[in-house]
């Protein structure tokens, strides 16, 4: 609106419209009109009596076109970049060629733009970074090889990756250049001059001298391919499990390596704001933007799974070679029985580790199969360049337990050459392309609000001053410089939040359009149900067949660290940790185990919330304990500072706010004032009138609904309009409160109907989930069994 109001101040937005109405096939645009007819059209320079205009979003930014016949053949008016990244890309060195280096070595004829840029970069000590934005399949790997072949003074190189598959692929391409893969090495890696290493293992390149000072190499060159994926990896839960370093400290160690290195090379198909911030942190840079479009793909979205599978299987029956890109590994498990007797390969996190080794020569390996399927375990690092696959099919999934829309396009891009450029995609969620999505400013505002609520710092370099008056302590922010880590984390949170079901297609559509591809919809009002396949064995049934007691878990953990696990051994570990998380003692009763797994496998987060909120876990996580910590506004360092610096981790901050919202809900419903609750504190029956009063009180007075826009992301809720507080919207408020409490293992539900004063009305119950409590009590030694699953839980 800022762009268009510059030319038409009285503009009104009318939504997104399909372009075929105006003979603009496969184009979607933003439609506008304006009321002041004296405003001059910026395209023709004349005033129109009635026509409106539209704006198209492209990979180059926003362009305005007018509906008037006088403007029909005139050039579109460029309005500006679609976001801050567009300006960053627009200011780069622009090229448009199939390969970054078309012919010859760096110093060889013919003269080429990228060759000159590389020579300038490596000969100028003042230019730290070369950043290359170029589509997949345009020779980024070849360009790096030519750099290493030409410059023999680049001896010490650190190549940072974020996926084991990427590390394998890089090693396969560069082992002849003297690189070693961290996955093949034991112990400390300080002595290796050319090293490929995953972010998670960066601590292995540091050593300590006799005085316990940290020592690491000064590298001639640090390379980060797939820079956007690397930045997003700092959201990984596996990094948070590191007992030696916090995620923030791991990030700082990476910065130290890069800051002291002589040169930095970063590459990706789509450099975003995370990349820009990262690049700018190290001083002067040269950015190259390759505008070449290898294959223009058409993503066709259907919500009919039955039809999707019929078309897929028909293509396979006709002998076509197909690739199935799935955001859900479990969907591939369901598909696998349909491939019986065919040549196929499936890559998921549960696949045999030997398959990872095959990816070093993927162009040879995948050609053996008619069908290739993979989950987000292959997001990057695999470049299949052969003419082999006729079609790609995509299974899309939203939510926090899968990859982002950006990662999906990375997955699709693994296949460089494709017989049919139309990609059929199944998606069961909403298909609106104009949803209100989360932005950087949204997430920044939320974290600022969480700091205020918790009284603890979340974003680094935010300085507070402590004021004490009338026995109350007030923390006021006096400066607000955000560290690079926090900037990038906020962008990561934006990407994560926009995986919400209502925003998923909107974000995917924008990314597809910006990449020069298109999206079309072929949805039906009532999709056919897929008939259950009796040949499919559920994942729970597969786990039940495994006797984990026959394996030594410590040996499997050692094999896991060396990437030597078989598929069966991975399932053993999965079952072992599932049982450990829930406190299951005995899985010999297979039927009971299957029932338990199907019921609770997807509720680990609910159990985590339940244990923390009701005080089963470390008491330092409770709300009461948080109140008494003063170290966060002083110069003191807390004890055990190796993993917990003076800042709250971002997730800890969100958990603390969630807990306070739950306490606030319960206090308002029960009309009490408590700082926290134990599992014995809930067990109430409310009359109809008490229930009605409670829900309206929560709607009117709770901290959640007072700042709903700030708190919705905490509970995976989408942005949108707020509901007025009235009887008409009563069900909405009750449904929201019920769902939020349920995410903590607290039940608030309608019970039996009773006659009260000659009228029939319902009772309402507020209590902890008995089954969840029984399981948690057993795990913490507070009970001897779980009534519903006595064979799994016994002493």
From Swiss-Prot:
Keyword S-adenosyl-L-methionine: no
Chain sites annotated for binding ATP: 134-141
Domain Helicase ATP-binding: 121-289
Enzyme class: hydrolase
Pfam assignment, any one: Herpes_ori_bp
Assigned keywords, A-Z: ATP-binding, Helicase, Hydrolase, Nucleotide-binding
GO biological process: DNA replication
Coiled-coil stretches: none
ATP-binding listed as a keyword: yes
MF terms (GO), sorted A to Z: ATP binding; DNA replication origin binding; helicase activity; hydrolase activity
SUPFAM superfamilies recorded: P-loop containing nucleoside triphosphate hydrolases (SSF52540)
EC number, UniProt record: 3.6.4.-
Family: Belongs to the mimivirus R1 family.
Main function: Probably involved in DNA replication. May bind the genome origin of replication (ori).
Protein name: Putative replication origin-binding protein
């Amino acid at each position: 609106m800022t762009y268009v109001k510059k030319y038409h101040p009285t503009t009104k937005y009318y939504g997104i419209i399909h372009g075929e109405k105006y003979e603009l096939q496969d184009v979607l645009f933003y439609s506008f009109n304006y009321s002041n007819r004296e405003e001059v059209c910026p395209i023709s320079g004349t005033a129109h009596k009635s026509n409106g205009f539209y704006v198209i979003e492209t990979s180059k930014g926003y362009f305005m076109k007018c509906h008037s016949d006088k403007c029909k053949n005139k050039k579109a008016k460029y309005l500006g970049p679609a976001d801050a990244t567009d300006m960053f890309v627009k200011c780069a060195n622009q090229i448009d060629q199939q390969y970054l280096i078309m012919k010859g070595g760096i110093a060889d004829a013919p003269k080429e733009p990228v060759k000159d840029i590389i020579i300038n970069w490596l000969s100028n000590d003042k230019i730290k970074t070369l950043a290359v934005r170029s589509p997949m399949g345009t020779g980024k790997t070849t360009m790096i090889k030519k750099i290493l072949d030409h410059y023999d003074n680049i001896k010490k190189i650190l190549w940072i990756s974020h996926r084991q598959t990427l590390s394998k692929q890089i090693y396969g391409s560069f082992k002849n250049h003297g690189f070693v893969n961290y996955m093949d090495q034991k112990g400390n890696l300080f002595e290796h001059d050319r090293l490929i290493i995953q972010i998670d293992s960066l601590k292995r390149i540091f050593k300590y001298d006799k005085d316990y000072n940290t020592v690491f190499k000064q590298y001639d060159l640090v390379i980060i391919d797939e820079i956007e994926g690397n930045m997003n990896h700092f959201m990984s839960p596996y990094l948070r499990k590191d007992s030696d370093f916090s995620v923030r400290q791991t990030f700082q160690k990476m910065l130290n390596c890069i800051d002291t290195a002589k040169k930095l090379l970063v590459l990706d198909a789509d450099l975003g704001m995370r990349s820009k911030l990262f690049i700018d942190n190290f001083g002067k840079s040269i950015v190259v933007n390759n505008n070449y479009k290898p294959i223009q793909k058409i993503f066709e979205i259907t919500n009919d799974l039955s039809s999707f599978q019929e078309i897929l299987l028909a293509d396979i029956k006709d002998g076509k070679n197909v690739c199935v890109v799935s955001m859900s590994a479990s969907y591939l498990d369901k598909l696998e029985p349909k491939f019986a007797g065919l040549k196929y390969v499936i890559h998921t996190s549960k696949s045999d580790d030997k398959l990872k080794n095959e990816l070093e020569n993927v162009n040879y390996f995948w050609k053996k199969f008619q069908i290739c399927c993979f989950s987000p375990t292959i997001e990057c690092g695999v470049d299949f360049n052969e003419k082999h696959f006729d079609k790609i099919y995509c299974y899309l999934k939203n939510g926090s337990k899968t990859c982002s829309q950006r990662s999906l396009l990375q997955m699709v891009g693994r296949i460089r050459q494709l017989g049919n450029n139309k990609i059929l995609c199944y998606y069961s969620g909403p298909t609106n392309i104009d949803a209100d999505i989360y932005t950087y400013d949204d997430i920044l505002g939320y974290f600022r609000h969480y700091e205020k609520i918790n009284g603890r710092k979340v974003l680094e370099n935010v300085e507070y001053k402590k004021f004490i008056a009338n026995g109350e302590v007030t923390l006021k922010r006096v400066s607000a410089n955000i560290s690079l880590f926090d900037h990038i984390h906020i962008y990561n949170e934006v990407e994560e939040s926009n995986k919400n079901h209502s925003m998923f297609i909107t974000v995917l559509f924008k990314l597809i359009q910006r990449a020069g591809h298109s999206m079309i919809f072929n949805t039906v009002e009532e999709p056919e149900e897929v008939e259950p396949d009796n040949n499919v064995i559920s994942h729970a049934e597969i786990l039940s067949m495994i006797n984990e007691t026959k394996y030594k878990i410590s040996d499997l953990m050692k094999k896991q660290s060396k990437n030597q696990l078989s598929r069966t051994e991975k399932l053993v570990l999965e079952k072992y940790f599932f049982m450990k998380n829930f406190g299951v003692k005995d899985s010999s009763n297979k039927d009971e185990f299957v029932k338990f797994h199907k019921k609770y496998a997807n509720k680990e987060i609910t159990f985590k919330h339940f244990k923390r909120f009701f005080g089963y876990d470390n008491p330092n996580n409770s709300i009461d304990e948080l109140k008494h910590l003063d170290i966060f506004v002083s110069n003191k360092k807390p004890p055990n500072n190796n993993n917990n610096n003076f800042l709250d981790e971002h997730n800890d901050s969100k958990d603390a706010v969630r807990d306070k919202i739950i306490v606030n809900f319960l206090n308002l419903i029960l009309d009490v004032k408590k700082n926290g609750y134990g599992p014995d504190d809930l067990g109430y029956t409310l009359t109809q009138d008490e229930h009605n009063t409670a829900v309206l009180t929560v709607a009117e007075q709770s901290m959640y609904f007072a700042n709903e826009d700030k708190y919705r992301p905490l509970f995976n809720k989408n942005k949108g309009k707020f509901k007025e507080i009235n009887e008409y919207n009563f069900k909405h408020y009750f449904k929201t409160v019920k769902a939020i409490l349920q995410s903590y293992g607290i039940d608030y539900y309608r019970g039996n109907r009773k006659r009260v004063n000659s009228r029939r009305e319902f009772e309402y119950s507020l209590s902890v989930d008995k089954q969840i409590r029984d399981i948690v009590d057993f795990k913490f030694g507070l009970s001897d069994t779980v009534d519903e699953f006595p064979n799994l839980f016994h002493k």
